């Protein structure tokens, strides 16, 4: 990811374009293929698509690819008009867009991270909507995408430079730091290097629930001092364990290698794991046939990740999975006390 993003002031690039996802799908086609450029001042929010689903942005078959640049080739492959794709392969990436605009509740549906990736790796860095689905908003934050509203877009299209702080002021202090440093991976790398100082937790001594005590005991940056947390505090806590599965492990492997180098390592590998449970029965299913090679690549890269990191291996044995990741993690990963 670019070390210079985001800048202190957000300004539109005169050589880039703004794509409006309108309810009139022909207008989208005209922007993609006929050079039509629109302005927010000539439209209303009611003209824009609401409830854009993450399955529309990256249908399940697109997720058989794991490299974001390849995923971007099929951005919005699920948006159909009379049975035909509105976005042909490469249409978003080839359109020269840096801003994408929609209506209410952008990113409903599944939580898949590939949805904002398809925009980010198509050149989109500014995402405009009246509102965002919460998980989709967080996934955009983790990629360092700048999100704003339609009034901000009107100002940008009129030539104004808007301070980054106006885009981030709605968030808590930790989230602002993540955005201001380009997303979760560059933020985490700088935090580990001591280049970022987390805001102090100001909660005074108080009675806490068990969950609050666990979070307080795992706060990053407390340096052994007794800390207290309360609802609403923005904090970062160390995670003792985690897992991934075939649909996500390849991306984890690639992102960590890109950010930390090919020799990256995980802390406490025995508390992390990979599961073979999502694509276990994909082999031999006719509708998965066209994606058989990609599915096998996902499996192979999960094996490579496990061998590289030394995390727990919950691969299938003789075609039988050890269990569903969500359930096994609850049963086997938690240490009492």
Residue ranges and their predicted role:
Residues 1-337:
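Fe-S-dependent hydro-lyases/dehydratases of central metabolism
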């Amino acid at each position: 990811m670019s070390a210079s993003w985001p800048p202190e002031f957000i300004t539109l690039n005169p050589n880039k374009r703004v794509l409006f996802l309108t309810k009139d799908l022909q207008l989208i086609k005209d922007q993609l293929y006929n050079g039509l450029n629109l302005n927010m001042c000539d439209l209303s929010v009611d003209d824009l698509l609401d409830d854009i689903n993450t399955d529309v942005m990256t249908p399940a078959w697109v997720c058989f690819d794991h490299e974001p640049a390849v995923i971007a080739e099929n951005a919005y492959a699920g948006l159909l008009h009379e049975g035909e794709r509105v976005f042909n392969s490469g249409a978003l990436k080839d359109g020269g867009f840096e801003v994408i605009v929609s209506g209410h509740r952008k990113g409903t549906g599944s939580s898949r991270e590939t949805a904002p990736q398809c925009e980010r790796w198509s050149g989109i860095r500014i995402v405009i909507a009246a509102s965002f689905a919460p998980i989709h908003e967080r996934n955009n934050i983790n990629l360092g995408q700048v999100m704003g509203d339609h009034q901000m877009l009107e100002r940008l299209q009129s030539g104004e430079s808007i301070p980054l702080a106006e885009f981030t002021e709605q968030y808590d202090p930790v989230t602002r730091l993540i955005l201001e440093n380009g997303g979760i991976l560059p933020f985490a790398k700088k935090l580990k290097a001591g280049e970022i100082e987390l805001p102090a937790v100001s909660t005074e001594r108080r009675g806490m629930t068990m969950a609050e005590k666990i979070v307080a005991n795992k706060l990053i940056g407390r340096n052994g001092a007794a800390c207290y947390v309360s609802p609403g505090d923005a904090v970062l806590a160390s995670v003792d364990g985690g897992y991934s599965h075939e649909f996500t492990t390849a991306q984890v492997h690639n992102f960590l290698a890109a950010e930390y180098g090919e020799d990256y390592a995980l802390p406490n590998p025995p508390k992390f794991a990979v599961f073979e449970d999502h694509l276990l029965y994909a082999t031999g299913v006719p509708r998965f046939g066209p994606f058989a090679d990609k599915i096998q690549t996902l499996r192979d890269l999960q094996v490579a990740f496990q061998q590289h990191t030394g995390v727990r291996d919950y691969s299938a044995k003789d075609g039988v999975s050890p269990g569903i990741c969500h359930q096994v993690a609850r049963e086997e990963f938690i240490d009492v006390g």
